[in-house]
Amino acid sequence: MNAAPSRPDSSRGAPKSPLREHVAQSVRRYLRDLDGSDADDVYEIVLREMEIPLFVEVLNHCEGNQSRAAAMLGIHRATLRKKLKEYGLT
């Protein structure tokens, strides 16, 4: 498989990857929009909001082939199927 080239870690002063920067901006916006409200499940919210479009887009790219999508994601096919069911994407 042709994986995207890895980028250096931004903690060493190298530029951030575009995806990482988009995620950071979205998280900052979400936290700002909380406007002082308490949220004790931010990790779960962010994970869900990232995984759903990730799975949808990778499955579309793989023309619905779950085995190929799981391989592309680097997870076991059973894990992908479990997540798809959990998110109501089956």
Curated annotation (Swiss-Prot):
Question: Which Pfam families does the entry mention?
Answer: HTH_8
Please give the SUPFAM superfamilies that the UniProt record associates with this protein: Homeodomain-like
Q: GO terms for molecular function, please?
A: sequence-specific DNA binding
Record keyword DNA-binding present = yes
Q: Which residues bind DNA?
A: 66-85
The segment annotated Disordered runs over 1-22
Q: Name the keywords, alphabetized.
A: DNA-binding
Reply yes or no: does the keyword DNA-binding apply. Answer: yes
Question: Alphabetically, which GO biological process terms does the record hold?
Answer: regulation of DNA-templated transcription
Which NCBIfam families does the UniProt record give?
A: PRK00430.1
Protein family according to the UniProt entry:
Belongs to the transcriptional regulatory Fis family.
Q: What is this protein called?
A: Putative Fis-like DNA-binding protein
**Which species does this protein come from?**
Xanthomonas campestris pv. campestris (strain ATCC 33913 / DSM 3586 / NCPPB 528 / LMG 568 / P 25)
Taxonomy-wise, where does this protein's organism fall, top ranks first?
Bacteria, Pseudomonadati, Pseudomonadota, Gammaproteobacteria, Lysobacterales
